[in-house]
Amino acid sequence: MATTEANTMAQANSQTTIEPVRHLANFPPSIWGDQFLSFSLDNSQLEAYSKAMEQPKENVRRMILNPAIDTNEKLGLIYCVYRLGLTYNFSKDIDGQLDELFKQLNLQSYNEADLYTISIHFQVFRHFGYRFSCDVFNKFKDSSSGKFKEDMTRDVRGMISLYESAQLRIRGESILDEAGAFAESKLKTIEKTLDGTLAQQVKHVLERPFNRGHQMVEARKYLFLFEEEISRYDSLLMLAKVHFNYLQLLQKEELRSVSKWWKDLDLPAKTLYVRDRVPELYVWILAFFLEPYYSEVRIITTKIVLLVLVLDDTYDAYATIEESRLLTHAINRWEVSAMLQLPEYMKPLYEILLNEYDGFYKHGRTNVIETSKKAFQDLARSYHQESEWRHAKEVPSFEEYMKIGTTTSAHNVLSKTALIGMGNIVTREALAWYESYPKIVQLSELIGRLEDDVVSVEFERERAPTATSVDAYMKTYGVSENVAVKILKKLVENGWKDLNEACLKPTEVSLDLLAPIIGLTNMTDVAYRHNDGLTFPEKTLKEYITLLFCVPVPM
């Protein structure tokens, strides 16, 4: 009897499947559902917008090229053009004008200029890569105290522009460090005394300086907050409104296309543990380029960033360490046969990944595709290393962590993936530059990793024993969390300074080739400055998606 009972229990135990422990994150669901799937592009409306832009565009071009317009007026016009996201329509015209104006520049002529004028000139030249000297701001400092003059605060418009100028600083420009701190402090005080549009302008610049913003969202907000200033140029105001609505239609069609692809894959249903973030990640990639002719770049890169997110959540929020090793091995092999060794839930992701990259070969840029693929494999290996640390409950040294953590920012794979659809601009030399792991990519990764870690450290600790850069820094240097966070934020600020310098002429490659790197970095700041905007999109990205795709600009 006892033997029979023992045999029965043994048989039952052998048939029992022990469910592995998984560090589920319980991510919030998509707040959009299938909302963007139902969009239908109205080609007649698109054509109407295109036609409506023709004359205003020509009028603005004539103003940019008009030799009778003085320097202040011309630079003010160019400032409005790029703040409104219109630069690509006039790139050659603007470059030609700025080259001439910069050659003629005489810093002595700024001795009598006001704060607003000097700040606008500084921003325009720095934005387009010219090494405009920050010494022009010395005149606003008190000669005895060495501090900025208090009476500057009466010029609110000038203070806003001074704060924007400070965001373009590079290392060694201590006067701009001081200017940024001074302007921020005074604007926070001034904001409490203001109302109406001026109060909104101050609030916005403190929340989101242009140099760290999403260019399409910033265009929309600039159009609303500064319409009175723009209205001096009737044609520019009309062009900006029509242009935004024109791009909105095109971008909604791109978002519909990607949403349908995602829906057809049915990955969220097959991998219930992942974040479903199609509109949010499309907005992320939209930060690269606004140009209509880069539509394919946006679609390709959005598809890959969605697969990156699934991969991230698989390693981070679901896979056991054994499954993680199998997935990494399969991605390293990059063969259909490798799928056989994977758990069932991983097979759809792996199959889709291989199919998507196979589809890219129709572009005929094998070397570019291989560069993206290698970066994806490197990303998988780095995700796996983080899994090994988590499994061992190990906190690596700060140096060890950053070698891996910068890669898992995914900036390298996404910037290289963008090259697939960029055409002949990606020369052999340009690709070699990207493959050399240039400093600007390293800076982008550093900023991305540290900003993400600083805002998500508590969430990661609550969910699983996951080491972040904060933990690694605390362990390596024996400091408190507050001290570690303060130091990491300083590293981020220095990263921005170096990034600004990398965009000054002469650049190693064209600005178009730098755009994906800059766009990724800006979106990191947008999403992670105050919270984890990708995991909890209702806090930041919901507003962006609403502004971009749900409401056209009133005409």
From Swiss-Prot:
Co-factor: note: Binds 3 Mg(2+) ions per subunit.
GO terms, biological process: diterpenoid biosynthetic process; sesquiterpene biosynthetic process
Cofactor(s) the record lists: Mg(2+)
Entry EC no(s): 4.2.3.133, 4.2.3.104, 4.2.3.125
InterPro entries: Isoprenoid_synthase_dom_sf, Terpene_cyclase-like_1_C, Terpene_cyclase_plant_C1, Terpene_synth_N, Terpene_synth_N_sf, Terpene_synthase-like, Terpene_synthase_metal-bd, Terpenoid_cyclase/PrenylTrfase
Residues given in the record as Mg(2+) 2 binding sites: 312, 316
A Pfam family the protein falls into: Terpene_synth_C
MF terms in GO: (+)-delta-cadinene synthase activity; alpha-copaene synthase activity; alpha-humulene synthase activity; magnesium ion binding
Binding site for Mg(2+) 1: 312, 316
Pathway, per record: Secondary metabolite biosynthesis; terpenoid biosynthesis
Keywords tagged on the record: Lyase, Magnesium, Metal-binding
Lineage top rank: taxon: Eukaryota
Extent of motif DDXXD motif: 312-316
Tissues where this protein is expressed: Mainly expressed in sunflower trichomes.
Reaction catalyzed: (2E,6E)-farnesyl diphosphate = alpha-copaene + diphosphate; (2E,6E)-farnesyl diphosphate = alpha-muurolene + diphosphate; (2E,6E)-farnesyl diphosphate = alpha-humulene + diphosphate
Annotated residues for binding of Mg(2+) 3: 452, 456, 460
The keyword Lyase is annotated on this UniProt entry: yes
PANTHER family reported for this sequence: LYASE, OS04G0344100 PROTEIN-RELATED
Domain comment (free text): The Asp-Asp-Xaa-Xaa-Asp/Glu (DDXXD/E) motif is important for the catalytic activity, presumably through binding to Mg(2+).
Function as written in the Swiss-Prot or TrEMBL entry: Involved in the biosynthesis of germacrene-derived sesquiterpene lactones. Catalyzes the cyclization of farnesyl diphosphate to alpha-copaene, delta-cadinene, alpha-muurolene, beta-caryophyllene and alpha-humulene.
Family: Belongs to the terpene synthase family.
This protein's name: Alpha-copaene synthase
Lineage: Eukaryota, Viridiplantae, Streptophyta, Embryophyta, Tracheophyta
